[in-house]
């Protein structure tokens, strides 16, 4: 897939969205697989390839859920492979409050926000240049921004929030 015309064509886009999905291969962040599931090695490779291209050109990138995790691994960070209490319950997203540090994210949404949670993994050690700007009450990183690149990641799914952020 790395040589596919689709990936080469995607690099011409103005921005990159890294969506949610299965877990990244733990070997990509130096760990053995202890709790990762739904692995898609070809997807990992394709997203990391695209991310490298967009970073080289300093184009905007937004990572959502798995996308935040891909960003963190790309910049040399690690992941918590299994995080109890953050995955969906009975097929529905959990809701919880987060606190946001002074940042463009706080400018958009304020100091506290109720977000959804549908993940069982999260950022552990942050990658180079990434700064945590939002946390769950238990300390789980819920959003990051890069210190010098137009790169943001959120652990929650803004596209599934009800209320003013929702398109429905």
Where are these regions (language model features)?
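Active-site-proximal beta-strand elements of phosphoester/diester hydrolases
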Residues: 152-156
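Pocket-forming structural segment of enzyme catalytic cores
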Residues: 57, 75-147, 158-164
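Active-site phosphate/pyrophosphate-handling residues
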Residues: 49, 69, 121
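Flexible gly/pro-rich beta->alpha loop and the following alpha-helix that scaffold active-site loops
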Residues: 1-62, 75-76, 80
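C-terminal active-site "lid" helix and adjoining low-complexity regulatory extension at the edge
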Residues: 166-168
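Structured adenosyl-cofactor binding patch, chiefly the S-adenosyl-L-methionine
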Residues: 72
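Glycine-rich nucleotide phosphate-binding loop and flanking beta-alpha elements
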Residues: 23-25, 68, 123
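Conserved G/P- and acidic residue-centered "switch" motifs that form tight phosphate/ATP-binding loops
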Residues: 65
């Amino acid at each position: 897939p790395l040589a596919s015309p689709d990936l080469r064509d995607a690099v011409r886009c103005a921005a990159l969205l890294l969506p949610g999905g299965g877990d990244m291969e733990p070997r990509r962040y130096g760990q053995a697989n202890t709790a990762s599931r739904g692995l898609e090695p070809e997807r990992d490779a394709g997203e990391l390839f695209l991310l490298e291209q967009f970073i080289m050109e300093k184009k905007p990138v937004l990572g959502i859920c798995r996308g935040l995790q891909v960003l963190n691994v790309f910049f040399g960070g690690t992941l918590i492979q299994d995080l109890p209490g953050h995955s969906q319950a009975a097929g529905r997203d959990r809701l919880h409050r987060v606190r946001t540090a002074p940042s463009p994210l706080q400018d958009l949404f304020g100091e506290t926000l109720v977000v959804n949670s549908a993940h069982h993994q999260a950022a552990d050690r942050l990658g180079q240049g990434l700064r945590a700007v939002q946390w769950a009450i238990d300390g789980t990183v819920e959003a990051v921004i890069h210190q010098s690149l137009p790169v943001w990641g959120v652990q929650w799914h803004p596209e599934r929030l009800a209320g003013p952020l929702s398109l429905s």
